[in-house]
Structures are given as C-alpha cells and as structure tokens.
Curated annotation (Swiss-Prot):
Residues 152-271 are annotated as: Disordered. Residues 168-185, 211-258 have a biased composition (Acidic residues). Pfam families: ASF1_hist_chap (PF04729). Histone chaperone that facilitates histone deposition and histone exchange and removal during nucleosome assembly and disassembly. One of its GO terms (cellular component) is chromosome, telomeric region. It comes from the Eukaryota. PANTHER family: ANTI-SILENCING PROTEIN 1 (PTHR12040), HISTONE CHAPERONE ASF1 (PTHR12040:SF0). It is found in: Nucleus. InterPro entries: ASF1-like, ASF1-like_sf, Hist_deposition_Asf1. This is Histone chaperone asf-1. The gene is asf-1. GO terms for molecular function: acetyltransferase activator activity; histone binding.
Length: 271
C-alpha cells in the first residue's frame, strides 16, 4: 500500500499561450510521517521519436509532509523552443507530471498537449518558420493516464517483494486455456471507456480530476504511439503515459514547505 496517494490534479491555466507557465493544483494524501521530502517534476516530451528532446521544465521539493490531505500549487516554466525539432513544435505531444520519494518514482500522470495556432488563417496556411507568439497550447486535462509504482518508503516492511511468490500449482494449469488470458482482459479494459477514462464529471472545474486508486496501473509505462486517433479526437500521436476523474477542494496541512529547487528552502503553505 502506498504511503502517499495522489487524489487530484487541476490544470489551472488551460488553454494558454505556448509561452505561458504551467500551473497545477495538486491534492494528495499522506498516511504516515515521512522522513524526507516529496520531489515533483514536470517533463515536456519534445519529440515522439526520441527522448533526447525531453525537457525537465521544473522540479519542486515539498516537505515536511503532515499526515492527512494536502494541497499545493506547482508552477513550471514553458519549454525551450530551441530544444524542440522545428517540425514538432505544432501538433500533439505529452507532458509528464511525476512524484518521487528518496529518488524513487511512485506516481506518474501524463497528459496529451495540442499545440496549434490561435487563428484559422495560420492554421490553414502555417508559415515556414513557426511563430511562437501565435501558438496556443491545450492540455487534454480530462484524459490523463496515471501509472503507479510500488516503492520502498521509510521502513523495510514497505518495500515491494524482490521476487514474485512461488506458485507450484501454476504448472498444473493447462497452458492452452490460460495463455494470453491476462492480455485479453487488459485489452478489454482499455477498450472500455468506463475503465480507460474520458468521462466528463459534472459540477467540476475545467481540467480537474480525481485519481482513483483502483484505476491506476501497478506496472510500468504505456506507449502513446499505440493510442487510437479517436482518443485524441483526431489530434495526432505522441509518447508518454496518460487516466480520468474530477477534483475535490480539500485544505492542506500548515507545516508543509515547498522548495522551487531540490537544494533550496521554499515557502510555507497555509492550511
């Protein structure tokens, strides 16, 4: 069981200009005292073909963490356009919001981002050289993809098992009956909109989601290049990990501090 659970993420300024800062309102719950801070990061995927163009937009140390439900604002700079291939400035890409404890990542939230010109004229007849000031970004906040990772927290008892438990009865199961059953079940859950997200939640602010524990994946990443065009509403392909929900307005503890750099002290947040 995770000591820290992500409850909700609200993309605050969306849509926005490409050059505007990213603002996220993040709500999470801490079940017990932690000895170290949480480190949040936002990464911009600059290319769908190579991670050499990935940019870490900002990182933030949050702590000490009071037990209970906490909320804070994460602000990150826009990407450096000089580090993005010119032919991939426009179109759909991905941003990844991650959190780690003691260098071990335990949750990742990915969003599709559509970058396009503000005017129909530029959309229909784009200039050879992109005009950055005229580009607008739109984060598909209602369709995030959430991935959880089991990690060791402060105690050895919290560490995930190094090896899977022995299953001697597994050899007695007929291979032809069981082979591929898990893969088929997983494909069925992905095809089900109720499982894969995408449902609008009435009465919630735009871009707000609630992260449900049973909707999170226990294993690694999801390749967005295999997502269908229907899920993007015709907006293209990209890489990353992206799931769905709504937000809750919950107060945070009064002892938590936020550092805008891993080696610096930050400001205290009020309850």
């Amino acid at each position: 069981m995770s000591v820290v659970s992500l409850l909700g993420v609200n993309v605050m300024n969306n849509p926005a200009k490409f050059t505007d800062k990213y603002l996220f309102e993040i709500t999470f719950e801490c079940l017990e005292h932690l000895e170290k801070d949480l480190e949040w990061k936002l990464t911009y995927v600059g290319s769908a073909t190579s991670d050499n163009y990935d940019q870490e937009l900002d990182s933030l140390l949050v702590g000490p963490i009071p037990v209970g439900v906490n909320k804070f604002i994460f602000e990150a700079e826009p990407p450096d356009t000089k580090r993005i291939p010119i032919d991939e400035l426009l179109g759909v890409t991905v941003i990844l919001l991650t959190c780690a404890y003691d260098g071990r990542e335990f949750v990742r939230v990915g969003y599709y981002v559509n970058n396009e010109y503000e005017s129909e004229e530029l959309i229909n007849d784009p200039p050879p050289k992109p005009v950055i000031e005229k580009i607008r970004r739109n984060v598909l906040a209602e369709k995030p993809r959430v991935t959880r990772f089991a990690i060791k927290w402060d105690s050895e008892a919290s560490a995930p098992p190094e090896f899977p438990p022995e299953q001697p009865e597994a050899d007695e199961v007929a291979d032809e009956e069981e082979y591929g059953a898990d893969e088929l079940a997983e494909q069925s859950s992905i095809a089900d909109p109720a499982v894969n997200g995408g449902m609008e939640v009435e009465g919630q602010p735009n871009g707000a989601i609630v992260i449900e524990e049973d909707e999170m994946s226990e294993d690694g990443s999801v390749d967005l290049e295999n997502e269908s065009e229907d899920e993007l509403d015709g907006e293209g392909d990209a890489e990353g990990e992206l799931e769905q929900g709504q937000d809750e307005d919950i107060e945070m503890g009064d002892e938590m501090e936020i550092d805008d750099h891993p080696k610096q002290q930050g400001m205290a947040m009020a309850q």
